[in-house]
Regions:
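A generic, well-ordered mixed alpha/beta core segment in the N-terminal half of proteins
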Residues: 106-172
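N-terminal amphipathic/basic leader segments beginning at the initiator methionine
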Residues: 2, 7-10, 17-56
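C-terminal functional extensions of proteins
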Residues: 254-257, 264-267, 274-352
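Short acidic, glycine/serine/threonine-rich loops at helix termini
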Residues: 106-110, 134-142, 234-238, 280-283, ...
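Ligand-binding beta-strand-loop-alpha-helix segment within the catalytic cores
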Residues: 144-219, 223-224
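Short glycine-rich or small-residue beta-strand-to-loop segments that form or flank ligand, phosphate
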Residues: 93-101, 123-125, 267-272
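Glycine-rich phosphate/diphosphate-binding loops that line cofactor/substrate pockets in enzymes
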Residues: 79-94, 214-218, 257-264
Length: 352
């Protein structure tokens, strides 16, 4: 028997007289009855009208932004710029939630400029941002080489950082008692006050670079949200856990009031905090809803070099879900990129 005859006989599992190469019983579909339609009748998501334009030589930043594609991140960036400019015109809060990296990559001068221009009306910090800002105010530098000192037990043990931050917080907590009022100061206001003393216990040589110091002078609220055990000042003998807890709770209540006022066009930006500030912001929204109404018609923005779960859910999705209908719906936008590039670009794109 020929080899070919043997192969063909094995390839007829259904007993059909038609010779097939495949051993499978299922047969491929036929395309002769597929229905098509004219290309021009289709709804398409991309058009040449949305394409990038070549910016003219010597174009300013606004012209360059206008030249970006009106697609995906290009359109998202434009939408964030528009929301910030609209909030400033309407005198609505623009709150920046700041993680530690935002401060330690050198963006304080831009944040201070945004404050003076009306694009930062309040700031919320995690404990790392507080520490970096404080160290910059004192000596003009920050950020330890952790692997180099961790094994020696030296990580986080700088005397001035631990002692004077804790003492500032304790003094702020006790200020209420001296004033005949049980309410002391929050962490942000207490540290801002410390940095602006006429006769501080140590030299504050780089005060103009401190967001906390500048905000205090300008009466711009800064709140600090501590999670016990996450920051180096919690290792220092000068810590008063009761004062720290009370002060950071005051800051939470202050931020809740600021978040409530976002209603009707305010903007909240979470920049570089993956866990603490997104969780705090969500609780502020819930508290506002419980005491009256969740803020509606707001814009939330998450800026980071990776889009994490909690910022996505707790900043962009959940807080905007309660106000995403009507004439002025809430919106959430993700801008992905390095802080040291994205924040300067956003600051430059905003109208003066």
């Amino acid at each position: 028997m020929r080899r070919g005859d043997t192969f063909n006989r094995r390839s007829r599992p259904g007993g059909s007289g038609t010779k097939r190469m495949s051993i499978y019983s299922a047969r491929p579909v036929k395309l002769d009855k597929v229905r098509t339609y004219p290309l021009a009748s289709r709804s398409s998501k991309v058009s040449v009208a949305d394409f990038a334009r070549v910016a003219r030589r010597g174009a300013n930043v606004r012209e360059w932004v206008d030249s970006l594609p009106r697609i995906l991140a290009g359109e998202t960036f434009r939408a964030v710029v528009t929301a910030l400019e609209r909030a400033r015109r309407k005198r609505k809060p623009i709150i920046w939630g700041l993680g530690g990296h935002v401060i330690k990559v050198g963006l304080s001068p831009l944040l201070i400029d945004l404050m003076h221009r009306g694009y930062l009306t309040a700031a919320a910090m995690n404990g790392a941002a507080l520490i970096h800002d404080f160290e910059i105010a004192l000596i003009g530098s920050t950020s330890e080489d952790v692997p180099a000192v961790l094994g020696e037990g030296r990580f986080g043990m700088a005397e001035e950082t631990g002692r004077y931050l804790n003492e500032a917080i304790v003094a702020g907590d006790r200020a209420g008692d001296r004033a005949g009022n049980r309410d002391g100061l929050g962490v942000g206001e207490a540290v801002g006050r410390f940095l602006n003393q006429k006769r501080p216990p140590l030299r504050v040589g780089f005060r103009p670079y401190s967001l906390l110091a500048t905000a205090y002078r300008e009466r711009v609220p800064v709140t600090v949200h501590e999670a016990i055990g996450t920051d180096i000042i919690h290792n220092h003998p000068a810590i008063d856990p009761r004062a720290l807890g009370a002060a950071t709770h005051r800051d939470f209540l202050l931020l809740a009031a600021l978040v409530r006022d976002l209603d009707g066009g305010g903007v909240y930006l979470n920049v570089g905090s993956a866990v603490v500030l997104p969780e705090v912001f969500l609780k502020c929204v819930s508290l506002a809803a419980n005491l009256g109404r969740a803020p509606r018609g707001i814009t939330t923005v998450n800026m980071d070099f990776i889009q994490h779960y909690r910022p996505t859910q707790n900043v962009l999705v959940r807080p905007t879900a309660t106000g995403n209908s009507g004439r002025n719906p809430s919106r959430g936008y993700a801008l992905t990129g390095h802080h040291e590039l994205m924040v300067p670009l956003l600051a430059a794109a905003l109208e003066k």
